[in-house]
Amino acid sequence: MQKLQIFVYIYLFMLTVAGPVDLNENSEQKENVEKKGLCNACLWRQNNKSSRLEAIKIQILSKLRLETAPNISKDAIRQLLPKAPPLRELIDQYDVQRDDSSDGSLEDDDYHVTTETVITMPTESDFLAEVQEKPKCCFFKFSSKIQHNKVIKAQLWIYLRPVKTPTTVFVQILRLIKPMKDGTRYTGIRSLKLDMNPGTGIWQSIDVKTVLQNWLKQPESNLGIEIKALDENGHDLAVTFPEPGEEGLNPFLEVKVTDTPKRARRDFGLDCDEHSTESRCCRYPLTVDFEAFGWDWIIAPKRYKANYCSGECEFLFLQKYPHTHLVHQANPKGSAGPCCTPTKMSPINMLYFNGKEQIIYGKIPGMVVDRCGCS
């Protein structure tokens, strides 16, 4: 009986020291810990997002071989930008892609052939400079995108000035060749006849795929072309060297090429949104807005989905990376551990002005995070 009384006294003493157990207090402490963890994760993601944006600026300038962003005003862009239908369609295409809120399938369609449009503007030619009577236009240099892919379409676009009365226009495209013994410096490419009504000028396209393919096979034969568009009175209506008020009406080439696929499938990574509570390495959405940067020199896209990686790389989830796991096991204090980083990236196509106020179309590699992982 005395032993039982002693146990009761001890039990009551322990309750007095420990105090009452408040279940609500324990729940609040647990909730505070969870909230603190979520806040830390949000802060970590925000830092990763800011770092990604700054890295994108540096990467674009570096990959375009630009020391600084070209300083071109919006007014200058309006004057220099070609006002032709295919370029407008290309810009509209970027707008459609931008407005599409869906991120597409998680599976890359690298198996199917993709078609790309390349807009090539005329440049200076040493041969044209040597010709005594300066021809009316045009020399085109071709990027590696055109040289190393299959050309499926090539259109020369020219702008015809408006006429005051109905007239028939005879359009002639001539290819420059090295002077022959009889003095001939041209050979015909295409000719066509079209009727024009009074009013605004028109854009006219001419198929030059065969000529372009010959130039690609024999680059030394590419000496330039001459463009003529004579009305019934012998007036040339073709804009070859734009006069004041004709900005953006230069001739140009629209070339469509097929890009050969390299892979068919890829494995998957985690995709999250900004409200996700996922702690593991994950891909998060990030939209880059070039207008917010003040980068008006980028014609298209004005914004694009770049994405970024954030999250923890716990060794519990590293069955896929046995080498990293073994290194950590051998020297846990000396190894920094894996980081959440892009494991697959894809390019973006871009229309932009370079430092010489020339319009360039190019593909910039490694600008979109497609997948994140621990490595």
Curated annotation (Swiss-Prot):
Cystine crosslinks: C272-C282, C281-C340, C309-C372, C313-C374
Name the record gives this protein: Growth/differentiation factor 8
Residues excised as propeptide: 19-266
Post-translational modification note: Synthesized as large precursor molecule that undergoes proteolytic cleavage to generate an N-terminal propeptide and a disulfide linked C-terminal dimer, which is the biologically active molecule. The circulating form consists of a latent complex of the C-terminal dimer and other proteins, including its propeptide, which maintain the C-terminal dimer in a latent, inactive state. Ligand activation requires additional cleavage of the prodomain by a tolloid-like metalloproteinase.
PANTHER family: GROWTH_DIFFERENTIATION FACTOR 8 (PTHR11848:SF150), TGF-BETA FAMILY (PTHR11848)
Coiled-coil stretches noted in the UniProt entry, renumbered to this chain: none
InterPro entries reported in the protein's UniProt record: Cystine-knot_cytokine, TGF-b_C, TGF-b_propeptide, TGF-beta-rel, TGFb_CS
Residues annotated as signal peptide: 1-18
Gene name, Swiss-Prot/TrEMBL: MSTN
Pfam families in the cross-refs: TGF_beta (PF00019), TGFb_propeptide (PF00688)
PROSITE patterns attached to this UniProt entry: TGF_BETA_1 (PS00250), TGF_BETA_2 (PS51362)
Keywords from the named record: Cleavage on pair of basic residues, Cytokine, Disulfide bond, Glycoprotein, Growth factor, Heparin-binding, Secreted, Signal
GO CC annotations, alphabetized: extracellular space
Family: Belongs to the TGF-beta family.
Subunit record text: Homodimer; disulfide-linked. Interacts with WFIKKN2, leading to inhibit its activity. Interacts with FSTL3.
Species the sequence originates in: Sylvicapra grimmia
A molecular function (GO) term: growth factor activity
Annotated glycan sites: N48, N71
Compartments (UniProt record): Secreted
Chief location bin: secreted
One example of a Gene Ontology biological process annotation: myoblast migration involved in skeletal muscle regeneration
Site (described: Cleavage): R98, D99
Protein's job: Acts specifically as a negative regulator of skeletal muscle growth.
